[in-house]
Amino acid sequence: MSKKARFGVVLVVLAACSGFLFPTLQWYFLTDAQTRQRALSSREQIKEYAVQSAERDLADLTRLARAGSDEDISARYAPLVAAARQNLSYSGRPAPSRWTAAALVSAFPVKSEQGFVLYARPLMEQTYREAVLKMKRRQAQAVKLGLDLSGGTSVVIKADLSEVTKGVPDAERAAIRSEAMALVLSTLENRINRFGLSEPVIRRQGEDRVYVEIPGLTDRDRVHSIVMGRGVLAFHLVDDDATQKLLDHYRNNPQGTFDAAHQLHDLSLVPEHTSVLGVYRKDSYGLDVRDGFLVVKKEPALEGRHIRDATVSSGRANEPLVLFDLDHEGARIFSELTTKEIGRRLAIVSDGKIRSAPAIREPITAGSGSISGFSAEEAQNLKTALRSAWLNVALEIENQQVVGASMGEESIRQGTRALVWGLCAVLLFMLVWYQEAGVNACVAQLLNLYIMFGVLSAFNLTLTLSSIAGMILTIGMAVDANVVVFERIREELALGKSRGAAVCSGFERAFWAIMDSNVTTFIAALFLSVLGTGPIKGFAYSLAIGVVSSVFTALFVSRLMFDYGTEVLHKKTVRIGWRIARV
């Protein structure tokens, strides 16, 4: 490879690593602790923060407007200023030269202060929400700290797939198992997010296991209750008359109908064998929000266990349809139900929340049906809910480990100290023993570490104590490649070759020795990553990444620096060890 091509490869690799590392550097070093804590909070907490911040800002703004303040408004009202400019442009009015509180409020097409607040609050809330969610996305791209460094709980969960595959043909079992595990992952994620836990790590491990990390949570009993809870889905008939009566009562008495938990204060408002359930939808935070209520029969008309499949399709007008199939018993029950209850609504209830309440338009006797009236996203959510009823897999906790936050902080200090001291010791030895050539080795070592962190960030891997151990080992192993190259160059110089010829021959002679040792190490790391679990995997990943990056820096970066000294600086000698070799 030519020197220009080699230089281009090095630049491309370093530029790529810079791009991969940017979110990590920005998250850990350029973001203040308060912003990081806010981004790591649950979506419920983010929503509360955005709503409260928007209400506080609008209260300050309206107070200044009432007082007739002549001061320029704060930059945090920039979204409102942009909307105000747009409103003034549409109405043909000029924008003011200075934006005061009164000028901003008067730019909106509302007649009262309350109307302005209702108009402006979504804009301000969106600004705060997007700022936090942007940091949350950035954190997801940064190198994450494992539980041994940050504290929390890790759980290995085994899914019992025997019931799911019972009676399924052998040719279809693999697909059913895969789909069941995908739904297990989705169910666990929804369940953990519902409890307001921040940034959980949920990933499949093997064929029938799931690995879960919950940072900051060290209560074993709470973890067990969150993970092991099982969802329930069923179809309930809606009592439309009772719903209308309760709705009329609610309109006349909105504060006294429900308590803070959305439970009725007066149970006599609905018939005895019914219950009031909320209708829920996903908001802009990805959270379930209550959007009305329905009175439904307590006894389910059809249990979710009878659902055998659910898919999303398109109707004649290209509108999303949710198609579902029932087993033999479910088909019989559903046929009788839909024949008898034409015109009534059938609520689909998942975990006590109504996801949909379609009307029964005609008898469904074929054991399959369709539900319409959704957006594409809502149809996908309903499909997932229906399939989770069919693939309701029993879960069992196989292993659970808890690491305290103080232990995590101490691990960070110890791991960082070991990495820094190990690197410094290696760099010092190379400088003292190999002198000028040692400078090249030191630069290569620093770039080696830089590339390793870049690759960790690129693949969204987690940094653990075992990963740090792998890095420390890699630093020591990377020296070996440089030592082999330096010794070969010294041998060539002893034969009387010039600096350029000795460097070229030295790298050529050292190439296969370096490749042989590193390829065998890489193969060992590959087997450890495939067969190992937990800390062994972390060690194997960092070792494999380090092997590749150390070979790259030894053969590309170090060679480039030698060539630079020869051809650009016109050096005639090279100092390797305690001798100076001359032409």
Curated annotation (Swiss-Prot):
Localization terms from the record: Cell inner membrane
Name under which the protein is recorded: Protein translocase subunit SecD
Signal peptide: none
Keywords: Cell inner membrane, Cell membrane, Membrane, Protein transport, Translocation, Transmembrane, Transmembrane helix, Transport
Membrane topology: Multi-pass membrane protein
Subunit note: Forms a complex with SecF. Part of the essential Sec protein translocation apparatus which comprises SecA, SecYEG and auxiliary proteins SecDF. Other proteins may also be involved.
GO MF term (any one): protein-transporting ATPase activity
GO CC annotation, single: plasma membrane
Family named by the database record: Belongs to the SecD/SecF family. SecD subfamily.
Segments traversing the membrane: 7-27, 419-439, 446-468, 469-489, 511-531, 538-558
GO term, biological process aspect, one: protein targeting
Top-rank taxon: Bacteria
Function field: Part of the Sec protein translocase complex. Interacts with the SecYEG preprotein conducting channel. SecDF uses the proton motive force (PMF) to complete protein translocation after the ATP-dependent function of SecA.
Pfam families in the cross-refs: SecD_1st (PF21760), SecD_SecF_C (PF02355), SecDF_P1_head (PF22599)
InterPro entries: SecD, SecD/SecF_arch_bac, SecD_1st, SecD_SecF_C, SecD_SecF_C_bact, SecDF_P1_head
